[in-house]
């Protein structure tokens, strides 16, 4: 039986991992590191990924209660508090939000790089928004039936919104739908505010369209060309159709 191969580091001997020879060593197990490892391994390289933490994910990690306390407090709380909080494994706290649009570019990149071979995704059961008009939380509709019953829209707005979405689906997007990326389409010469006005959408309809569907962070987009907003709304629709409950998936 051959002796175990070791490597010397700072005066100590450590057993070699695999055969001890790698083309690339990547430090960290965050999203970008995993994507890089996947791309390099697809090229036939031997890749070793190391992480100084006791958990995977880097800045994108999901931590149990013990890991969370050690990261932000340095140590666990006293025993009586631990008992009150329950089992550490019952907690899974994301360090950053991880919702992905199911048909978005990041989802495509994860698939191409092979990261999806090591991750499982599940569809979020629903998306909810707070309506300033009705002062209540409501589910974003994903079916015709839900759209007709949602409190987010008045009856007249539901009819106008149906026409709006029908119109959106027929609009040409540069670089998509068989349209050249540099082609000058009508959307480039129209602001989003003008687009909303064309279909008669009120402020409430504009709010949840721009922020809950197109995911704009503020209202600056209203006076910008409507192309990017229409593209985002279409992506939202494609992503909902992919799974039927919500446009978002979660690893």
Model-derived features: positions:
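Conserved N-terminal glycine-rich FAD pyrophosphate-binding loop of Rossmann-like flavoproteins
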Residues: 52-96
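Short hydrophobic alpha-helical runs that function as membrane-insertion/retention elements
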Residues: 47-50, 119
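N-terminal Rossmann-fold NAD(P) dinucleotide-binding loop
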Residues: 33
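Gly/Ala-rich phosphate-binding loop of Rossmann-like dinucleotide-binding domains
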Residues: 37, 41
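Eukaryote-biased feature marking scaffold/signaling PDZ-domain proteins and nuclear chromatin regulators
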Residues: 19-22, 86-90, 101, 116, ...
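Glycine-rich Rossmann-fold phosphate-binding loop(s) that bind the pyrophosphate
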Residues: 28-30
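Extreme N-terminal leader/targeting segments of oxidoreductases
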Residues: 1-24, 42-46, 63-73, 77-78
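Rossmann-like flavin
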Residues: 94-97, 105-250
């Amino acid at each position: 039986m051959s002796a175990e191969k070791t490597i010397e580091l700072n005066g100590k001997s450590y057993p070699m991992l695999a055969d001890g020879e790698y083309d690339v060593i990547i430090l960290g197990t965050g999203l970008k590191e995993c994507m890089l490892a996947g791309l390099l391994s697809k090229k036939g390289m031997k890749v070793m990924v190391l992480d100084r933490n006791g958990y995977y994910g880097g800045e994108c990690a999901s931590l149990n209660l013990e890991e969370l306390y050690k990261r932000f407090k340095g140590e666990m709380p006293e025993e009586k508090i631990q008992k009150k909080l329950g089992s550490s494994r019952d907690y899974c706290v994301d360090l950053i939000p991880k919702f992905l649009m199911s048909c978005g570019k990041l989802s495509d990149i994860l698939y191409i790089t092979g990261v999806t071979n090591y991750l499982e995704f599940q569809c979020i059961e629903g998306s909810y928004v707070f309506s300033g008009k009705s002062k209540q939380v409501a589910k974003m509709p994903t079916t015709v039936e839900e759209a007709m019953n949602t409190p987010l829209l008045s009856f007249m707005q539901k009819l106008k919104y149906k026409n709006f979405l029908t119109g959106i689906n027929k609009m040409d997007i540069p670089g998509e739908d068989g349209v050249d990326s540099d082609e000058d389409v009508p959307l480039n010469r129209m602001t989003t505010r003008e687009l909303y006005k064309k279909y008669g959408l009120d402020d409430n309809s504009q709010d949840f369209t721009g922020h809950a569907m197109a995911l704009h962070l503020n209202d600056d987009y209203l006076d910008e060309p409507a192309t990017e907003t229409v593209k985002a709304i279409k992506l939202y629709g494609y992503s909902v159709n992919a799974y039927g409950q919500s446009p978002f998936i979660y690893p």
